[in-house]
Amino acid sequence: MTKWKKLSHTIYQCKYHMFGIKELLSDETADKVWEVTNKHLKRKEMLPQSILKKIGAKIIFTTDDPADDLVYHKMANNIEGITFLPTFRPDAYCNLFDDNWKSNVEKICQLTGQNITLKGLVEALRMRHSYFAERGAKASDHGLLEPYGLKISQKRAEEIFQQAYNEGEKFSFRSIEIKEFISYMMHKFCEMNQEKGMVTQIHYGALRNANEYLFKNWGTDVGGDISADSVNIIENLQPLLSRFFSGENSNQSHLILYPMNQIFAHTNLMLERAFPNVHSGFPWWHNDSPYMMEQYLLHTAGSSLLASSGGPVCDGRKILSEGSRFEVFDRIICKTVGKLVSSGQMTYSGGVKAVKALMYENQVRIFNLEGESAIN
């Protein structure tokens, strides 16, 4: 149980809220914590559906591969009072640096009956995008090192596809070819989202698998990811923003930018001011603690309009975290706005409006959820 040793030094160990456990998780208490939590998890009220109903979940977005048949969403939507909606996540078909990229392209082209070409890949993804939209999808989600959006010609994109697929050339994740290819695909995805009235979400700034030893020996998602310290935002995004989120197109679709690190949040807030349908989302890893949530809200209030923020996403892989993360966020909103009101920096009515917008109204408006039966 030595893997729990470091956890004894962490703060925010809130196991007692769910399981009544007051001891810190450590080498000495790990076995007891394991036994007690498993005992609690066997109770009927700790079943997934019971937890979701207890926390008042109405609509839950999942993140799904475009090739997913979404059969479990249909089954889950038989749960009274909760709607599960898929989210289109096409990273696997854009990341030329990934060892599985070629097989992923073959999979989705075969699934949709398309030729294995750039044109075939785009059409295959368009077909699956429509499939998702027909089943209630409200957004696409894209995990990028940088928010790529350069204007790239089809000819250039085809050259890169040819190099990667037919010639087997390997590109590093920071290569110009990666930037150009993903930029081309992001324009295609924004086209699709605009046609279907879906939101484009970009999570950027995560440097994956920085610890090569961990990656080679244990694979991905084992603690070797870090925050990138250099991200080009404006130069990369400006062509995409000008095409889809300005002028006559400014009210047709929404873009939410979630930076990995709060150091990039100020740029997002400036973009939010310049482009009406671009929203600054919470820096997701940076804001997993109450302290950093409060700092970000104050930064937003001082740099942009607090009430227009895109708010946080849970990004939780565990059902028990769904309610707790949003409860912490809601409490921090009330605490932060309350301080602004009590110090005379906001009116009481303005504070109430900001809290309602951040907790609920912005999500309903941006993701076009007014017609969903679960919230009516």
Task: Spell out what each predicted region is.
Residues 209-283:
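Active-site-proximal binding-pocket segments
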Residues 199-208:
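Histidine-centered catalytic micro-motifs
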Residues 142, 203, 239:
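Histidine-centered active-site/metal-ligand motif
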Residues 1-196, 248-253, 257-262, 269-376:
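Metal-cofactor-binding active-site regions of metalloenzymes
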